[in-house]
Amino acid sequence: EDFMKGPGKRDLKRGEFAAGITIPTPPARTGSAYVRHTPRVAMDIAVVGVGAAVTLAPKSNVAKDVKICLGAVAPIPLRAVEAESILRGSELTDQRIAEAAIAAAAEAKPISDIRASEDFRRELVRVLTQRMVSAAADNARTPIAKRRAA
């Protein structure tokens, strides 16, 4: 989380480079989902991106762990820690996920620019967080061989 220091700035000294990253194998009953909203297919710059990873407790719909990351709504990718804490240890109901999505929108630090206004980006964060947490939870409940993309 501390590797990104700002736009175009990384935690590297002069002459250093990142040779690779290690991503640990997720626990059982973990699912993830990611989406990015762009104004058109030909444009590579996202208006908003939202990723979610959910680990469910065995044989229940209770979230053991939740990670939500927001892109293009702050100078660097941003963890929505308040939204995560609303869900962690809770049954993942539609209402609880909606509450967390509102919190994620409040945590975002969007700007207004030519692609979208601050208000529009915040609303996109809310809607896409709700969708991605739901999709990640669905994936966590589904055996890997039967999963579909979000």
Language-model segment annotations:
Residues E1-A150:
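C-terminal structural segment of proteins
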